Regions:
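Aromatic-rich carbohydrate-binding modules that target alpha-glucans
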Residues: 57-96, 118
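Short, polar loop/linker segments at the starts of domains and inter-domain junctions
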Residues: 39-44, 48, 219-234
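Aromatic-lined carbohydrate-binding/catalytic grooves of carbohydrate-active enzymes
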Residues: 206-230, 240-264
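Extended acidic/polar, glycine-enriched regions
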Residues: 82-133, 139-190
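Non-catalytic, glycine-rich low-complexity segments
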Residues: 2-57, 116-147
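Beta-sheet entry/capping signal
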Residues: 63-65, 92, 100-102, 246-251
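N-terminal carbohydrate-binding accessory modules
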Residues: 186-208
Length: 265
């Protein structure tokens, strides 16, 4: 059955299947070649800029990171991506070793950031926020309960401090960067989605660009009665290097035999 012949009923998934679908979509990730079929090329020391379209249903705040590693490494590096508008996210990482690498995009609902966004909007509009403050204290307590020390102790201290403040002071503390940092460490990554893992082939720097110098070894001689040798070429290497060349290129070198030489038919 083609898309053109689908009826509206065919496009509606059963509730049991719909509930299993991810809330977060990760699309149009770059750099990617043929959906990850082939590896992106890079060189050691290159900064790789990554862009992606990430969105979800509703108005919750998203957290998006790049996960990357050298293929032989067990652990992943993480780089926070920035929201650039219109569901666009961007970030970058630098590869420092030669060999195969891989990366993917990881996204989740940032529960505390979503709470802070709503709290700020309502507080600035003069809307009563007593219920929101109660919800926020509950979020901090839940974060403490799922964390280990010393993070647990710091979150419990934050919860205790919030409980003794006036409403305006609680708002200020909830919106403080230190509170966001603590809650980020304890985030349970709600509705986590992970993209396809994409390969990167990291080459040595000269694989991207190099200056090539070509010469004929037999012509490198200071004696008209003697053809040049590789030893004569060795003596020329400092001069070639000083001219700014990186690679020495030889044309095809054919051995000359006494009986079946290249010039004999």
């Amino acid at each position: 059955m083609t898309a053109e012949t689908l009826t509206p009923d065919d496009r509606v998934l059963p509730l049991s299947q719909a509930l299993l679908l991810p809330r977060i979509a990760i699309e149009s990730t770059m750099p990617v070649i043929d959906g990850g079929e082939f590896a992106v090329k890079a060189v050691v020391g290159q900064r790789i800029s990554v862009t992606s379209k990430v969105f979800a249903d509703g108005h919750d705040t998203l957290a998006v990171v790049i996960r990357w590693r050298a293929l032989q490494d067990e652990s992943w590096h993480r780089v926070v991506m920035a929201d650039v508008g219109n569901n666009g996210w961007e970030g970058a990482f630098t590869v420092t070793a030669q060999g195969p690498h891989e990366y993917c995009i990881e996204a989740w609902i940032d529960t505390f950031a979503s709470f802070c966004y709503e709290l700020r909007k309502k507080h600035e509009a003069g809307v009563p926020v007593s219920l929101e403050l109660q919800e926020g204290r509950s979020l901090v307590l839940q974060a403490a309960e799922r964390s280990d020390n010393p993070l647990r102790e710091r979150l419990m201290l934050l919860h205790h401090e919030l409980s003794g403040l006036l409403e305006t002071e609680q708002v200020a503390l909830f919106l403080h960067d230190d509170s966001a940092h603590l809650m980020t460490q304890a985030d349970h990554h709600a509705y986590l989605s992970i993209s396809t893992v994409y390969p990167i082939d990291v080459e040595r720097e000269r694989a991207q660009f190099a200056s090539w110098y070509e010469l004929f070894p037999r012509s490198i001689t200071d004696d008209p009665a003697r053809h040049g040798t590789f030893n004569d070429v060795h003596a020329r290497l400092p001069m070639i290097h000083d001219m700014g060349f990186d690679v020495l290129y030889f044309p095809p070198i054919h051995p000359i035999g006494r009986k079946i030489g290249r010039a004999h038919v």
